[in-house]
UniProtKB/Swiss-Prot annotation:
Homohexamer or homoheptamer. Organized in a ring with a central cavity. This is Lon protease homolog, mitochondrial. Its main location: mitochondrion. One of its GO terms (cellular component) is mitochondrial matrix. Coiled coil: none annotated. It comes from Aspergillus fumigatus (strain ATCC MYA-4609 / CBS 101355 / FGSC A1100 / Af293) (Neosartorya fumigata). PANTHER family: LON PROTEASE, LON PROTEASE HOMOLOG, MITOCHONDRIAL. Residues 1-62 form a transit peptide.
Amino acid sequence: MLRGQSLPWRAALHQTPRPTVLRPLLPFARNNGPVRSNLSISRLSRSPSLSPRAFSTSSIRRKEKPPSDEKEDSNLQEQKDPNEQKDSDRSPEGRRRSPDSTGREPGAPTSASGRRRDKVAGEKEQRGVEEDAKKENVSIEGKSDPTEDPSPIPVNGGGSSDTKSSASNGGNEDGGRKGKKGSGDRALQKPSVPEVYPQVMAIPIAKRPLFPGFYKAITIRDPNVATAIQEMMKRGQPYVGAFLFKDENADGDVIENLDDVYDVGVFAQITAAYPLRGEASGVTAVLYPHRRIKISSLLPPGEQSKAGNTEDKAPEKKGDVVASFEEGVAEPAPKDLYEPTSFLRKYPVSLVNVENLAEEPFDKKSAIIRAVTSEIVNVCKEIASLNPLFRDQISAFYTDQFPGNLSDEPAKLADFAAAVSAGELHEMQEVLEIMNIEERLPKALVVLKKELMNAQLQSKISKDVEAKIQKRQREYWLMEQMKGIKRELGIESDGKDKLVEKFKEKASKLAMPDAVKKVFDEEINKLAHLEPAASEFNVTRNYLDWLTQIPWGQKSVENFGIKHAMTVLDEDHYGLKDVKDRILEFIAVGKLRGTVEGKILCLVGPPGVGKTSIGKSIARALNRQYYRFSVGGLTDVAEIKGHRRTYVGALPGRIIQALKKCQTENPLILIDEVDKIGRGHQGDPSSALLELLDPEQNSSFLDHYMDVPVDLSKVLFVCTANVTDTIPRPLLDRMELIELSGYVADEKMAIAERYLAPAARELTGLKDVDVNLQKDAIEELIKSYARESGVRNLKKQIEKVYRKAAFKIVQDLGEEVLGEDKALTDEGKAAQEESKKETEEGDPKDPPADPEKSTTETPRLALKVPESVHLSIGKDSLTDYLGPPVFTADRLYDTFPPGVTMGLAWTSMGGAALYVESILENALTPESRPGIDITGNLQPVMKESTQIAYSFAKSVLAKQFPENKFFEKAKLHMHCPEGAVPKDGPSAGITMATSLLSLALDHPLDPTIAMTGELTVTGKVLRIGGLREKTVAARRAGAKKIIFPADNMSDWLELPENIKDGIEGHAVSWYSEVFNILFAELDKDAANKLWQKQLAGKPKKGPLEEDD
């Protein structure tokens, strides 16, 4: 079926069919030689009454004659009057004869002999064209023409529903049933189409225009237009004009305004009309276009005007040619214009005055025309190879439209290309309007190319869909066959069904969110349709396993008891007041609200103060599950966010693994060493922690492997770090910092007695043995072996003491008391005998024959030490267990010489004493040049503090001691001991300035005074950090006084009394206060005149002066 046509047009195809001669479609090559086509040919019946006619008017006639058959002429002459025969031979209607010379009615069945006669008639018809072209060279003006007859033109068999002849020749409306062979007169009757029809009823059409020679079925719903069509059919004048709407969405059967439609359309014949189903007034009309026409004026519906009115004139386009292009023919005087549609004035329909459009003359041998024609034929072949229906259309079109050579009908070929294509509205209309064949053919080729692309796309989609359907049908068929075979053989299933049921059972016990439930259902359906041998099966199974092991909606019952939490925390840790207070606050809030949200805490402190171990105690106090993982040195983001499932061996991140292990949504997760996280080519894990540790985001944490949101808002995160300098600022901002300072000697003593010593005794097997580590020994151990702020090294030293004691006990008692045979059980003795036997049979140098048996741990019993054993470890015997003390002295100097001061520093190990030494490199002389050298592995900030202190010291000496010229001539050297330890920070400013002034004033300082504070060039003392650690270091170094900035007074007040015990604190704001404390006993007059003797000598003479 042609595009845009409906079922009724098939009936019109068989109105008055004629047998045609089948010819192959012949494309043309560049040498103009015919090439045989492989395109298949199918037969098509086409009514000769509906074939396109040559254009003419009342005063102009075409020069060409249609082909005629000699036999037909002779037959007609026998049946007609000679005069009539003479006139009819000259008229175009008389020359158009039916090629059927057998006398049978068109549409009757054709026998084999009839088909042979058809072939002979076709050959004669082609020869007749050539003879007529030679003979017919005279004008036909003045001859009789049916179109000049003012009476209505009858249409016999042209679609009239009430003519008797239409029923006899198969031209009725029932779809063209073949009628019986009628009489010879009736067989020779044929309808005629007027070449001039100045006024027609205009019917607007939508979507695509009509092209001459191609049927189109349209639907008429306007009752007036439907009634007019029926009237036209009854009168035998079923001719209308079809014009395309400019608006694709427009609808209607009447043209209200000439601007609504294109002015170029087609003159069409209504071959059949059928009433619409379900509608009383509507009809479906089948139109057959004959030629192109152009609107000259519009008579709006209901207007009673004559056809001569020229209102709403349509603009005339360039290239529009009216009537024939024959030259040298004189036009007769105009006659009164016949109006065949005058009976339609009573209906409110659209009447238009039209004029015929004729094609411009063209050269059939033009290279452009031949090339484009050949390309159109090639494209048609390609489309035909993809679409069988299009192949039938091409065959029917060639059989019907091309009785001669294909190159002789390029205009029809262009119309065919546009008629069967699905182009744009304006493109199709352009093909209809263009009268120049060389311009029309490329336009039609473009439209046909688009149809080729559509056909290719449809073919591809059809093949893909068909392949998918076949694949699914094949899989389904095979699966059903396999199930049937297993069922017949009684073979059990592969376990997939049980696996699916297991996952569904697990999921039913979990409170999955809607988004997770949706993903679970999709994955379980995928698993059910996968074969166990498929690689995707294991991936899906592992994913479902992880998805069902996450504790969706499962929480542990928390304990909000304050007393219980205090008891648990004190059992495991001594001190750590800040941490314990924060956890108690957390519990109190949960007790009041009834629930608690997850928090992110960060414990910052030196090593060994209990940051990691306190996390486990917090989980026990809150009755939460505990999970710890370290991120120190971590460089792969996938450890936190997981791997994508596309990778082999992919796993979720550590957070999802923690939830799987804890089986609760509210565990305590300890992220250790967060300040030592790394960065590599696999990403920045610290940036991945931003989402994890953000309370606003972790409620929908997205792991790469799980790819579903996981709620972490109820998890209590505890991070640990030694320093905060290496933690990115955005990450640090998301955590609540709790600083843990180092332990003082008293705290270490309590920790050692309560926790470390009992644990070490049990670890070394001395739990039930009378081994006593005296208190003075622990004090000496803390003082001389473990000065660190933490207790990790102290724990090591205590364990070492007990190990030495265990060795001493075993050695003293001997093998007689603690024999090996007493330690073995019966199983152990049997294993020992078997091992000994195997050793004797084999070479002693050979490795064991059965490594698994030989390396298996032999069952043993713990030996009991006799109660008579007593061991006491005191201060004096500590060297026998631990060796010489590591720290031999608390301070470097018993008394300070001039230029030496004791400062205080903060390190990751806690606080430490920082000594600053300044000396005079050379003796002072008038020729001396000032300067200062700095050593001690000082970092940039501390070097700047040295320059500030040097400049400030010179300023103080110049103001308060103007006669002292020490800094003007002194070459100085400043050093900070322990040069292997890098030192940085601004807090040693007042210490350095004091060291320089002590040397310049030659005044030694009190060795029991320690100081810390940042100094500016104007003498202002600024705030410092780590006052607790520095105070502990000062106390350990034997300091009695400590000078610190006044801005740190609040930190000083918060220090425990056991730390401040025996130390006097002095808060200062300016260095003048520091000077008054340190140099209170200084003789200012003597200090002012100091160094005058050294600088008063005469300068040495130069070499020239000595010669004189």
